[in-house]
């Protein structure tokens, strides 16, 4: 549910702005040149990978707040890797996080989302209790 909401916002922005990716703009290869052909005509702004990573980080942090710092650190680094690899500009990644945050805030009022989160919290509590022994 939240992944779909975040992707919708990202896809609409990508279609509107169609910003060239850094590797295409500067004629330099990414760290994974085999993916360049499929991405060269796909807009850079905002970063969809970052949006998904940030949404997952926010969700997992809500499910297990005691590990929130570690979870969000990984979510942050996942987005930054898109800049390091040459797929995105920093502003693309920042906008991906913003799309994720807005999408995550929007689903908070959904009864369906809250029901699924309640189920997930119970499942995680069981797993965490089992792993303590």
State what each model feature region is:
Residues 85-93, 97-101, 105-110:
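Catalytic cores and adjacent binding grooves of peptidoglycan-active enzymes
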Residues 130-133:
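Long, charge-rich alpha-helical interaction segments
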Residues 1-85, 106-116, 122-123, 128:
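Hydrophobic alpha-helical bundle signature of multipass membrane enzymes
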